[in-house]
């Protein structure tokens, strides 16, 4: 059975994950990031279709997001959390992933997903972006569906930009 659920993401999106580590690990940015996440969660807390809170997009990981995740879990412990950029760390300290419920990736191959699941992956696996729906981009879904259906620790995925961006003419 397929269904449509929403992963709600705040507007913290830097498109340069590895280069944003100084922001993600800088306590001076905690309030700025927390403010965006707080506004998103409070705005959409009563929307039943929202099943996952996302901390943002491609913006590295550090103390700023650890604090934001702690706030989200204290405010709404019922919904799941994910942050794909949690993998982008500087390796200089031990990171806290305790408030992340899901391990998420963008556009992984089937073999990459299998490697995580068959290895020491300790969180359910979800594709936070896949099947980019631009032009004739959305393809190969059947292979992903078969993989999801055959592995209990996968949660499916979220189609990125669920619409074509072609120009509409009358």
Task: Give the role of each language-model region.
Residues 3, 7-170:
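Substrate-binding/catalytic cleft of secreted carbohydrate-active enzymes
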């Amino acid at each position: 059975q397929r269904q449509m659920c929403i992963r709600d993401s705040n507007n913290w999106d830097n498109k340069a994950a590895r280069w944003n580590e100084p922001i993600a690990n800088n306590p001076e940015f905690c309030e700025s990031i927390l403010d965006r996440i707080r506004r998103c969660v409070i705005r959409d807390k009563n929307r039943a279709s929202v099943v996952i809170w996302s901390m943002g997009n491609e913006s590295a990981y550090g103390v700023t997001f650890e604090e934001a995740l702690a706030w989200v879990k204290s405010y709404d412990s019922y919904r799941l959390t994910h942050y794909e950029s949690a993998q982008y760390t500087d390796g200089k300290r031990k990171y806290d992933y305790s408030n992340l419920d899901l391990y998420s990736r963008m556009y992984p191959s089937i073999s990459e997903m299998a490697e995580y699941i068959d290895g020491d992956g300790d969180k359910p696996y979800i594709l936070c972006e896949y099947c980019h729906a631009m032009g004739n981009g959305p393809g190969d879904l059947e292979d992903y569906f078969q993989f999801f259906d055959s592995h209990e620790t996968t949660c499916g995925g979220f189609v990125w930009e669920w619409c074509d961006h072609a120009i509409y003419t009358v």
